[in-house]
């Protein structure tokens, strides 16, 4: 009887051990299945199949409401976030973005990324080197602009001086023309007056000469040889006085003619001298 009881106990213990082994084999599979469900829930909670670039670089799970997800995509966000994390640190950037309004965070991330890239390329000046280069370029452009403006002002002043000289020269020419016109008219009137006086005196002298020629005719000469009555002698004296006056007029006419010729033709007299 005792042997039967011992065999029954050993069989029960074997059954219990097998049952324990089975349960131990089933628990890992159940834990794996529950972990897969939780991972699926996590992925569905973020709404994206892959984590953002920041979480991918940090090798952490991208939870819902990740502050880096809207600004660092999954494609190139990891490289951008690497520079930001190396220069500023992920925790500092996260704190900075939390203190900035949502509508201004994108601009902040762009500037932070640019500053990080500039700091990595130029550890001494960083983005200040770009600012200095732009300032130097602005200064050089302002200097060129000032030179061009001064040249433009000088050209305008020169053009104004040329125009003023031209107008002054034209005014002088007009004044000379106006001043020469009255002189020419006065000279012409004076010359015509002198010429007319000379012609009148010349005609008078010619008439007197004709009269004297008639007196010297042969017929008149015979009568002149005869004694003349006293009244005719008086007439002869009067004629002699008239002839002397006509001779004086002729000399005056000749002198006036010479003066008129000098006035009308001054160049000839000048050449003769």
UniProtKB/Swiss-Prot annotation:
Gene Ontology biological process terms from the UniProt entry: jasmonic acid mediated signaling pathway; regulation of defense response to fungus; response to jasmonic acid
Biased composition annotated in UniProt, kind: Low complexity: 23-39
Xref: InterPro entries: LOB, LOB_18/20
Tissue-specific expression: Expressed in roots and flowers.
Spans annotated as Disordered: 1-39, 221-248
Stretches with biased composition (Basic and acidic residues): 1-15
Domain LOB: 50-152
Family as reported in the entry's similarity comment: Belongs to the LOB domain-containing protein family.
Record-given protein name: LOB domain-containing protein 20
Lineage: Eukaryota, Viridiplantae, Streptophyta, Embryophyta, Tracheophyta
């Amino acid at each position: 009887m005792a042997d039967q009881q011992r065999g029954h106990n050993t069989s029960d213990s074997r059954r219990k051990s097998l049952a324990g082994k089975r349960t131990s084999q089933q628990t890992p599979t159940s834990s794996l299945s529950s972990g897969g469900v939780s991972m699926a829930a996590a992925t569905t909670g973020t709404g994206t199949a892959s984590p953002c670039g920041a979480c991918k670089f940090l090798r952490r799970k991208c939870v819902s409401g990740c502050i880096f997800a809207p600004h660092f995509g999954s494609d190139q966000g990891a490289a951008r976030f690497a520079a930001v994390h190396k220069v500023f640190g992920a925790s500092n950037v996260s704190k900075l973005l939390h203190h900035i309004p949502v509508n201004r965070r994108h601009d902040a991330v762009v500037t932070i990324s640019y500053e990080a890239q500039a700091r990595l390329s130029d550890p001494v000046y960083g983005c200040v080197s770009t600012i200095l280069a732009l300032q130097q370029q602005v200064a050089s452009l302002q200097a060129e602009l000032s030179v061009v403006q001064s040249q433009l002002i000088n050209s305008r002043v020169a053009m104004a001086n040329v125009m003023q000289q031209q107008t002054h020269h034209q005014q002088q020419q007009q004044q000379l023309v106006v001043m020469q016109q009255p002189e020419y008219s006065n000279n012409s009137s004076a010359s015509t007056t002198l010429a007319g006086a000379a012609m009148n005196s010349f005609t008078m002298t010619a008439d007197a000469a004709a009269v004297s020629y008639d007196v010297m005719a042969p017929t008149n000469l015979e009568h002149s040889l005869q004694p003349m009555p006293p009244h005719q002698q008086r007439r002869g004296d009067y004629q002699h006085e008239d002839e002397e006056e006509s001779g004086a007029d002729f000399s005056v006419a000749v002198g006036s003619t010479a003066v008129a010729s000098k006035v009308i033709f001054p160049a000839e007299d000048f050449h003769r001298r």
